[in-house]
A protein has these predicted regions:
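Residues that form or immediately flank small-molecule/cofactor binding pockets and catalytic motifs
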Residues: 27, 100, 111-112
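Short, compositionally stereotyped local motifs that mark structural "simplifiers"
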Residues: 1-53, 57-60
Length: 170
């Protein structure tokens, strides 16, 4: 019919973890695979687009091989909050670093406050900042999931999901 559509655009964000080898220590839900964790494409607020990896029974835990020892000033990740789809924000995170990929030392641990039920669907960025910067080749990240939906939720028998998109290392 001669009509054209708008060009498709996708912004790619590069960081030290982008497209680096990643080893999952916990498996995501089969419907929400983990290819999106460090592909440089930021997930949208609609989790079904495929840019999100989802966990329902385990915390997310992964090791990224940066390829060589790098300076690390920040490790960050995006989490999705969508109470309507029983997706909750991360409950906390831990970061470890290693030079050999076998012996890790913990450099960060934080628990996050629960966001009140009914909050607007959104993407939340969580950051672990290091000053002075660290040096390591391997970064291990564990993102803890909420174990139960809020008391006000319409069906507390459902198990909440944790959806993670990009893992960033700067």
């Amino acid at each position: 019919d001669g009509r054209r559509s708008e060009p498709f655009r996708e912004e790619v964000t590069f960081n030290k973890a982008t497209m680096k080898p990643i080893r999952l220590l916990t498996a995501p839900h089969p419907k929400y695979a983990a290819a999106a964790l460090n592909d440089g494409l930021r997930g949208k607020r609609v989790f079904t687009y495929g840019n999100w990896a989802g966990w329902q029974d385990d915390d997310m835990e992964a090791v990224i091989d940066l390829g060589r020892q790098e300076e690390i000033a920040q490790v960050a990740f995006n989490a999705l909050l969508d109470y309507g789809s029983h997706i909750m924000d991360a409950a906390g995170a831990k970061v470890w670093v290693s030079d050999d990929g076998e012996t890790f030392r913990e450099v960060y641990g934080e628990h996050y406050p629960e966001i009140p039920y009914g909050a607007v669907k959104r993407i939340l960025r969580h950051e672990a900042n290091f000053s002075p910067a660290l040096r390591a080749r391997y970064v291990k990240l564990r993102v803890m999931r909420s174990k139960q939906l809020p008391e006000a939720y319409f069906d507390r028998n459902l198990r909440p999901f944790l959806f993670i998109d990009e893992i960033y290392v700067y």
